[in-house]
Amino acid sequence: MKRYLWPRSPLAWVVIAAVIFLVLGTVVPPLYNNQTRPLAFDQNINTVTAPSAGVWMDAPAFIAGAKATGDSKNPQCQEKKAPIWCYLHHDLLTIERNTTTAEVAEDDALAHSDSLSRLLAGETPLAQITEHSVLNRESTYPVAAPKDKWEFLLPAVDTGMARTDFERDGINYFFPSGTEQRSYPFFDLASQSSTAVDFTTTEKLDGIPTYSFHHYIQPISLADMRRNITTEAVDSGSGEKQLAAKDFRISGPAKRFYDEDSRKLLGLDPTDRVTVEPFYTVGRDISVEPTTGTMVDLRENIKIFFAADEQQAGTMVANNDTEDRSIFAADMRWSDDTRAERLDEVRPVIRTIRALMVVGWAGKAIGVGLLLCAAYMYMRRHREG
């Protein structure tokens, strides 16, 4: 019996060793990759942008025709129903975001994803968005079912809007592991729409290879967005309030919305009556570590401004003529600490994968070498026999 369990022939031992090394080199790296591939449960990710010089409008005061509250010293700002730029505040702005994941009890192939994003002027919250999705852990796309929830709140005016049990398409915070050099549908939380985020180039951040993606949304009407989605009132603690489509449009003489240069550009007289509404546009540059699909850097150039229609909004953006009518505008990038934290998060995984690549290559090389040695031993024994 021992004869069969413990082969005495050196040739047999060489063959066994070759098989072991080949199995190690072939099986172990993919096993680790498959283990780290799905979106992990129990993530708790905090990101914050570096304080960025930006502008925001006291829109409620402007719409109500109240005394100008902005930081402009223009004499016109002392007038009743002052021009729109008299309500602008120039501040250091930041965006904070917390994103968490959790398991879905009924299906371990899915994960809950929840996020809270807050826009701050100093310590003062200007707006916040909460979002809930159920994601496929392999693709990081939301499931094809009405599982999503979204809420937008303006704390200063104690109002907002919410959506529940709707279906969305496109990734948002998580890219799939094994990110490819191609375009992906990207869901924008502010506009509630999905458009392509496009691969642009590769680069290294602190020695880690990353893929760069660019996402751009042409100016779109937030009034149209509000009209095209089904929303619910927001219970802000002092009663349920909801932004309606009519709340997004305001009217008045052109001189209240456009200075002389802008009126010349748009062909308007000071007394022409105009109706304007908020338009939103954003350009994003995203850096992704492709093995894990982890976002390691994000820059967003956000503009929300008043314009009469889509054509005028496009003209204003093309001529960089949006600031005086800005509801919000800032070019924001993750802080150095946030980028370092995200890179530190992926660094151990990258090191392990690189080590396993060496193990895989070495295991296969040793296994092949041992098989060649076994073949030589067999041929020599055959000749001697």
Residue ranges: model-predicted function:
Residues Y184-I304:
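Membrane-proximal low-complexity regions enriched in glycine and acidic/polar residues
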Residues L88, Q218-P219, M357:
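Extended interaction regions within the primary functional domain
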